[in-house]
Amino acid sequence: MDYERQQHAPIYEALERFRKKRVVPFDVPGHKRGRGNPELAQLLGEKCVGLDVNSMKPLDNLCHPVSVIREAEELAADAFGAAHAFLMVGGTTSAVQSMILSVCKAGDKIILPRNVHKSAINALVLCGAIPVYVNPEVNAQLGISLGMEVSQVEKAMDENPDAVAVLVNNPTYYGICSDLRTIVKKAHARGMKVLADEAHGTHLYFGRNLPVSGMAAGADMAAVSMHKSGGSLTQSSLLLLNKSMNAEKVRQIINLTQTTSASY
């Protein structure tokens, strides 16, 4: 990680430069940086609403970033050890769905745990992929589902050699992690992609003596919820890619469903 470069916040710095120019707004959003909705400005503060602006050349565009947003994504990729990172504003729901839509088409099989998040199920509805469920065991004392065992995943792969991907919760809602490294190794040996739902695993990238993160384990893609445990505002998330994925194709998939009016 380039620690010196990580000291920069390119999007925020661009927003501050723009705010100081005191440009009169004749575009969206309708609150006109607080002037059109003083109640909102009083609630959130003038500085906050003053930074809620429309996409424009000095501030880049999330759908096709070429300057400050692109630099921010490069910084995120560097920090998380990924080949590429996408800033997501539709929560990790949009990141999970983009992962699945990027590797699955109608009729394709994907192996996933039965306690997968509903966003993954909705993605299967959208693309027509076929789920192959693995039923994690349940800890009767705690009353919670555990992670997928390697033997369970391997059995599903042997019975469905035509599956195109395996999705792993890393960790589950209750903090349970599977042996992700081994699952990645066995899936890749069969030509299958590995997708990591890390909605509750942001800390795995930065803490010591913690389970392995998706990128470190060699997963092809990982959906990381920055707002859940990373300290950012609600709905902010990251979609991480390893070198095995085509970033331009994934960008196109993201743009199919992500808003064109992203909030800064």
What are the functions of these language-model segments?
Residues 19, 25, 31-35, 70, ...:
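Residue-level detector of solvent-exposed, low-hydrophobicity positions
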Residues 24-31, 50, 56, 99-110:
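A short, flexible N-terminal coil/short beta segment enriched in small residues
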Residues 27-47:
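Conserved oxyanion/phosphate-binding beta-strand-loop segments in alpha/beta enzyme cores
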Residues 48-94:
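Conserved N-terminal alpha-helix of the aminotransferase class I/II PLP-enzyme fold
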